[in-house]
Regions:
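Short, acidic/turn-prone active-site loops that include or flank metal/cofactor-
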Residues: 2-7, 54-57, 78, 182-185, ...
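Short hydrophobic/aromatic-enriched beta-strand-loop microsegments
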Residues: 1-2, 176-182, 230-242, 372-375, ...
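Short beta-strand segments
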Residues: 24-26, 160, 181, 213, ...
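Acidic, Mg2+-coordinating active-site environments of NTP-dependent enzymes
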Residues: 12, 18-20, 45, 61-156, ...
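Walker A (P-loop) phosphate-binding motif
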Residues: 8-57
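General beta-strand structural signal in soluble alpha/beta enzymes
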Residues: 1-2, 25, 50-53, 157-159, ...
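Carbohydrate-associated surface elements
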Residues: 166
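ATP-dependent carboxylate-amine ligase
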Residues: 36, 43, 312-321, 325-335, ...
Length: 485
């Protein structure tokens, strides 16, 4: 399907000069969140966008629909022009051809005042981005577009792609692409981690800007070695890095913790007028973009997801100011560390989509950064190695409640920790037990690291049962379920 989609874009370019920005996302975990958020940021910045792929709807269905919509728009505009020309024959000839050109990143202070309806500390932080901080990512150069069909089609495509789609694709060349992370998954299909990672790496094509998670060694290994040319400086593949730590290169994104506050930041080149010695370290200016607490999606891992989306949308020429407001508005995807309720100062989270070890590790690290967590684990383990859970459980968990068929396997993997391990017969019992273990300020996280089919119809059904169990606790405590944000 991906090869056919790529061929379709090539045909549209040949026929109409259509050259959209294509932003592609893959990774073991976080794909849907980053895809959805990137699409929202692009739209918030005023560009027309289509989101498709593994997230749904399919690539070809969405492309077919976009072409049909564009044809209708072009026909309507042609009819309107013809009617106007009949009324005033000189009107059309006096109007210049309309062209579009790539936009550039503008400053956060360029956001209209009407966007800042609520006066908060976050608004002040966004508005404090001054002109000297207005560095721009290198943007792809697109030709001016004259054909009405090309103008009517989306300016940007945001695609969520799986390893299965990428494994056999040909001719796919996105503008920018990311592999968010790599951990064990789908090894029954790919045969090995090396083959799985190689399939993911196909997303970059030959020329795409590589948006890389610098905290994932397997992702960083996907960047090719510089091409060495005789008597010339080695040529590096264009890349922008993001991660949960401080950025170390101009243009990269990261997280800064200062005076107890966590910020999303970008590194900019220091004052270029101050020439440094040839062997001196590169000087950076850290631009604070917004407090991480202003995000509605919770956890450090989601702050990193936000940085990935911000980097991708920036590469398509989206204005920074509107995107930062878009980040604050995004509420997240269902069953992905989704807040459910706060009961007696304990917050409950539904992460039923956490069906593999990597997803649960990320959720524990994300929520555990500022609180202790009681985690509900277990289900159909898919033959995974659960040992990577031991470290985050040891660091962040107050207790573990085990359910499902592979609970004994997970117990064995966590036996070396000093965190109490409890067994529960079903989800209702697990929620009640987790609530009893949790203390004020803690989180109860249902992130099973397993598939759901041993006890439930699917992960959505598992989430529904979890939410019902939390609702029963809330009712007994006299708390409304709206307590979750």
């Amino acid at each position: 399907e991906l090869s056919l989609f790529a061929a379709g874009l090539q045909d549209l370019k040949a026929c109409f000069g259509y050259a959209p920005q294509v932003l592609a996302i893959t990774g073991t975990n976080g794909k849907t969140t980053v895809t959805s958020l990137t699409g929202q940021l692009v739209a918030r910045a005023g560009k027309t966008v289509k989101v498709a792929g593994n997230i749904g709807p399919t690539l070809l269905d969405t492309l077919t629909e976009a072409i049909a919509q564009a044809q209708v728009q072009v026909e309507q505009e042609a009819a309107e022009r013809a009617a106007a020309e009949l009324e005033n024959p000189d009107l059309l000839s006096e109007q210049p051809l309309v062209t579009t050109a790539p936009e550039t990143i503008t400053h956060a202070q360029d956001e209209p005042a009407s966007e800042a309806a609520d006066t908060t500390d976050t608004d002040e932080a966004l508005d404090s981005l001054d002109e000297e901080d207005a560095a721009e990512l290198p943007l792809p150069v697109a030709p001016a577009v004259h054909d009405p069909m090309a103008q009517a089609l989306p300016q940007v495509w945001v695609l969520e792609l799986s390893s299965f789609q990428l494994d056999s694709c040909e001719g796919f060349e996105p503008t920018a692409a990311t592999v968010l992370n790599i951990s064990q998954d789908h090894l029954d299909w790919h045969g090995s981690m090396a083959a799985y990672a190689a399939a993911k790496a196909r997303i970059f094509g030959a020329q795409a800007l590589m948006v890389l998670n610098r905290e994932d060694a397997q992702v960083m290994a996907m960047r090719p070695e510089p091409v060495r040319v005789k008597l010339q400086k080695p040529v590096e593949r264009a890349a922008v890095l993001f991660g949960g730590d401080m950025p170390q290169r101009p243009g990269d994104f990261g997280i800064e913790v200062t005076h107890g506050m966590t910020w999303l930041v970008r590194a900019l080149e220091a004052d270029e007028t101050r020439r440094r010695r040839k062997d001196a370290a590169e000087e950076l200016h850290i631009q604070r973009l917004m407090p991480a607490d202003a995000l509605r999606i919770r956890g450090r891992h989601n702050a990193v997801n936000a940085l990935a989306a911000l980097t991708l949308a920036s590469s398509a020429g989206c204005a920074l100011g509107p995107m930062l407001y878009g980040l604050r508005e995004y509420r997240g995807e269902p069953h992905r560390v989704e807040p459910v309720a706060i009961i007696q100062e304990v917050e409950f989270f539904d992460d039923s989509k956490g069906t593999n070890v990597g997803a649960t590790v990320a959720a524990l690290q994300g929520l555990g950064a500022d609180r202790r967590v009681v985690v509900i684990l277990g289900g159909e383990g898919k033959g995974q190695d659960f040992s990577p859970l031991a470290d985050p459980v040891q660091r962040f968990a107050r207790g573990v409640v085990l359910i499902g068929r592979d609970a004994p396997v997970i117990r064995e993997a966590l036996q070396g920790t000093d965190v109490p391990l409890h067994d529960a017969a079903d989800m209702q019992a697990a929620v009640a037990q987790a609530a009893a273990i949790a203390r004020s300020g803690d989180a109860v996280l249902m992130s099973p690291a397993c598939a759901s089919f041993d006890m439930f119809d699917n992960y959505g059904h598992r989430a529904e049962v979890f939410v019902q169990a939390v609702a029963s606790l809330a009712e007994a405590a006299g708390v409304a379920m709206e307590g979750g944000l």
